[in-house]
Amino acid sequence: MQFEISQSTSNISESDGTSAVLEILHRIWEEVETGNLNQKRVNLEQLLQHAPAEWFHPGTNHDLKTKRYQELRDICTQVILLLIKQTKISLASCHESDAGDYKYKEHASLAYSAMSLVKLLLSKLSPIQKGKLSEDIMRGNAVRSCDTHAEHVEVCASSASNGCQVGYQDAEQRLPRLNKVFRDSQECRSQDVSMQSSPVVSQEMESHFSIRPKGIGLFGSLPPGITEEGSERTTIEGESEEQFECSDRLLRDVMKATVGPSIVLCASHAQKHPWTNKASLQAANALLNQLTSTCGCNSLPTLLSGCHSDTKRNDGVNTKRLIPKGAFRLAMVELKQQLTRNDWKKYPAAKHTFAWLLAHLKHPYVGDQLDHCLPPSLLFVDDYEMENKVLGIQCLRHIIDNVDPTELRWYGRAEVIYEALHPLLYNHKPDLIDILFPCLLAILKVIEKDPKKTDQPRKLGRYDKALQIILNNMEGEQRILVRQANARHLPSFIDVMGITILWHMKRLIRIIIAYLETSDGPEETGRLLTLRILQAVILQAWPRMMTHCSDLMKSLLKLLLDISRGPTDISPEVRDTVGKECIECMTLLKRCCGTVVEDTVTKLLDSNLEDKLVKDCLENVLKS
């Protein structure tokens, strides 16, 4: 079905291109409301594409009225919001019914159609460049000047008929589906005897002409009686300024009302999810680019945080005040109703949308939005599902990294974050451990003083409490993946705590020796991680290494023998890596304990060792 705007559907007898635009937008509204968006998307896009951009700017009409501007502004805003609303309803129905692939595919197709139409409409609303506006007006008035056309001819007809003007055929070239607007307008004006003006026929380039009502320019009505060159230039400049200011005003009003919901729609389709497909991902990216450029921003983080540039774009739009406080707050107003404590699980897309938006908000603007960022993040962390816990910790880590520590300590926010993370230390899920430990360490740096500072007597603090829980978990853990996850992040705690690690030395050494004695597969991941723990302990607690040197040397030598004589499925690369890490540990012990390590290594080399790997490692220790 192809849509045409005719006299029967729109009162265009007293209107111009803006009336055609209003008719197009009303038709889109009707089709979206009836649920025919997917079926009629192509036709609706063609209607928008073929409409000249000048028709979307009331400022291009000489007889601009406030009512006309408000009508265009309201219908543009309502169409965009209705498109977004339909996608929200569709996605909510998918979640409620636990939809399968078919339902999600249908929603993805609907979202693609909605985002494509929103992008196209916003591109039409973007202000036209001033230079282009002047050229268009001059082209519309050029048919009245005899000095610039050698073959310009004027023919006068009966004064009772309505005047008409011959000019370019841009209407049919630019809008094939809406050319009936011009014909209907001409017929209506020819029947209007109130004008009582003589027809004027202008012929240009002999074979290239069309007819339009007198006084109606190609993109709107022109001031009557412009014949002198000087007055024509003055009108062009004044009308160009009026056109541009009105176009800018229209864009600002529409964007302020729709940028938040539009960004939320894009964010929900910015990553791969069950409710997205390749087309919706591309449409979301395209719409985000359109929103960014329309608001005068050079990147998405700038759009979310606010446009603070004093410069102007090529089309002259002042970008400083378009979205001065950023679109993140507007997007959160849209998301807030879906992220309440009782209802947020009904909208699985909302949590991913929030996380995506937060990830693109950078320092120092995250601090300004803490009231919007912190509650949803804590809500996710407190949930019993592992996926939501991980997502919440990721959000908290981004907040910690992008907010000044002093600002986090205001009103006890850092304490709240720590209290939310601390109970998770008792969890034994590898995926959670990998993301929890770095986040916990980051918040401890905010709320606790540096343990390495010696300005006052040291006391057990929250670093020590967290480490005690970690060591308790490690000491009795038998699951390989959990052991590896704990061992992977323990060196970070040791490096931060420094010499205060001495309070936990006995348990640490006991865990290190136990982990070195246990193989966890051909890759020996657990042993390699344990060797790095030992290196961190030696570096931070070197004054006490003499006490534990003998036990550690025995454990390292056993490890070398086990690797050299172990299963054949251990690759040479793994053997070499383990050997290098053992050499590093023995070298550090030698520097701490002096001749004790050297004497032990020398005695072993003099005993005619048969294992080449052990012998090479010991020789390297003496040389280092």
Regions from the PLM with identified roles:
Residues 139-238:
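Long intrinsically disordered, low-complexity regions that are acidic and Ser/Thr-rich
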Residues 2-134, 238-294, 479-624:
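Alpha-solenoid helical-repeat scaffold
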Residues 2-7, 11-25, 34, 57, ...:
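Charge-rich, low-complexity intrinsically disordered regions
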Residues 247-258, 273-376, 385, 390-391, ...:
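Alpha-solenoid helical repeat scaffolds
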Residues 17, 64, 68, 72, ...:
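Non-membrane alpha-helical secondary structure
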Residues 37-62, 111-136, 212-215, 219-225, ...:
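HEAT-repeat alpha-solenoid elements in large eukaryotic scaffold proteins
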